[in-house]
Amino acid sequence: MSRAEEAKQQFEKGFLCAPAVLSTYSEQLGLEKTLAVKIACGFGGGIGRTGRTCGAVTGAVMAIGLKHGQVNLADEESRLRTYMLVKEFIDKFTTLHGSIECKDLIGYDLSNSGELRSARESGVFQNKCPGFVYDSARILEDIVL
């Protein structure tokens, strides 16, 4: 099974989008899996169920930071490389899906309780979100890992 499939499977088992992506790669990047799940937890639902940046995207951005992020103030090269890789990731995800915003991707504003209920009833979390998790992981592997 590919790592992208593993991330998708993690999501389908019940992990939120951001933890599903980040935890799939965390141990290879030096972060304990349970800690990765905790760190990424608040990023689900477009960051705290606000419908903003997709959790699958933020999970991948955190993985990019773990792999290439700046570790001290003098390390400007790592910071700039991280920015470049994040931009490349976002460009590729946007090319595939038209946006990185959760509410644009799923068609519901999760910050609105009525729309959240409608989203759940529609099955969007089962029908669309696994694909976003899979694509985020696949793009992450293509450009970073």
Whereabouts are the PLM-identified features?
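Polybasic, low-complexity association/targeting segments
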Residues: 1-13
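Mg2+-dependent prenyl diphosphate-binding active-site environment of isoprenoid biosynthetic enzymes
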Residues: 20, 57-69, 80-83, 91
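Acidic-glycine-rich active-site phosphate/pyrophosphate-binding loop
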Residues: 22-42, 108-113
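Short glycine/serine- and small hydrophobic-enriched flexible loop segments
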Residues: 23-27, 62-69, 138-142
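Phosphate-handling active-site elements
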Residues: 28-38, 66-85
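Glycine/serine-rich anion-binding loops at beta->alpha junctions
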Residues: 43-62
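C-terminal binding/interaction regions
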Residues: 82-145
